[in-house]
Curated annotation (Swiss-Prot):
One MF term in the entry's GO annotations: phosphatidylserine decarboxylase activity
Enzyme class, spelled out: lyase
Post-translational modification: Is synthesized initially as an inactive proenzyme. Formation of the active enzyme involves a self-maturation process in which the active site pyruvoyl group is generated from an internal serine residue via an autocatalytic post-translational modification. Two non-identical subunits are generated from the proenzyme in this reaction, and the pyruvate is formed at the N-terminus of the alpha chain, which is derived from the carboxyl end of the proenzyme.
Protein name: Phosphatidylserine decarboxylase proenzyme
Gene Ontology CC: plasma membrane
Family label: Belongs to the phosphatidylserine decarboxylase family. PSD-A subfamily.
Organism (species): Rickettsia felis (strain ATCC VR-1525 / URRWXCal2)
Domain of life: Bacteria
Key word Membrane present: yes
Pathway: Phospholipid metabolism; phosphatidylethanolamine biosynthesis; phosphatidylethanolamine from CDP-diacylglycerol: step 2/2
HAMAP family to which the protein is assigned, alphabetical: PS_decarb_PSD_A
Signal peptide: none
């Protein structure tokens, strides 16, 4: 039984219906045409790969902000946070992470703390690599206060292909760094907003690994001092 549980654990539950559907269609196609069946099974294998849900070695420290998603750090700039969170006209540092269809799409909590507010905003589906995607695209915004008293924002943004955002958080949740909290299907973007003058540890063009890459350190510690926990 444990082996079956481990098997399901490595696939995000959002993928179950897709994988089952692809597999069923593949068997039907294979019964009529071998080549079509092969194409179907390749598509099924890709679907399993897309919804993979690997463990990560999460650096543990109350001062750290880690990447909530796999992808390329496409942009770092000063910008206003999503207006629906009621943070006013004070700019923050925005770190934008672009996920292509080959990245892990499971999202993770960036810091230890408490969820203060959530807001789902329906919108358009521009290419998530465009700057205007942060403003106009469908998004799920989350405001949290870290255990160090810092307010940070992280936003799941739907892209040109992604048409479903899943967020399992609720207001008032106490959360831990690296915990899984949602997923975006298929190809998307995640923005992280941090207070100005935050010490960033990433740069534009860098590859980020969700749950592992340290985006910022409020305490400016050296990496060698961090402890790591598998999640």
């Amino acid at each position: 039984m444990k082996q079956y549980n481990d098997l399901f654990k490595i696939i995000h539950r959002e993928g179950y219906i897709f994988i089952a559907s692809f597999a069923l269609v593949s068997f039907l196609l294979a019964s009529f045409n071998e080549k079509l069946g092969c194409i179907g099974f390749i598509a099924t294998a890709w679907c399993i790969y897309f919804f993979r849900n690997p463990d990560r070695f999460v650096p543990i420290s109350d001062d750290l902000v880690i990447s909530p998603a796999d992808g390329i750090i496409q942009e770092i700039k000063e910008a206003l946070p999503p207006p629906e969170l009621g943070l006013g006209d004070v700019e923050m540092i925005r770190v934008s992470i672009f996920l292509n269809i080959f990245n892990v799409h499971v999202n993770r909590i960036p810091a230890n703390g408490k969820i203060l507010a959530l807001h789902y905003n329906p919108g358009k589906f521009f290419n998530a690599s465009l700057d205007k995607a942060s403003i106009y695209n469908e998004r799920q915004s989350v405001l949290m206060e870290t255990d160090q008293g810092q307010k940070i924002v992280f936003v799941q943004i739907a892209g040109l292909i992604a048409r479903r955002i899943v967020c399992d958080l609720e207001e008032g949740n106490e959360v831990k760094t690296g915990e899984r909290y949602g997923i975006i299907r298929f190809g998307s973007r995640v923005d992280v907003y941090l207070p100005l003058k935050t010490a960033l540890l990433v740069s534009k063009g860098q590859t980020a690994i969700g749950g592992e890459t340290i985006i910022a350190d409020f305490g400016r510690k050296k990496t060698a001092e961090f402890k790591f926990e598998r999640k």
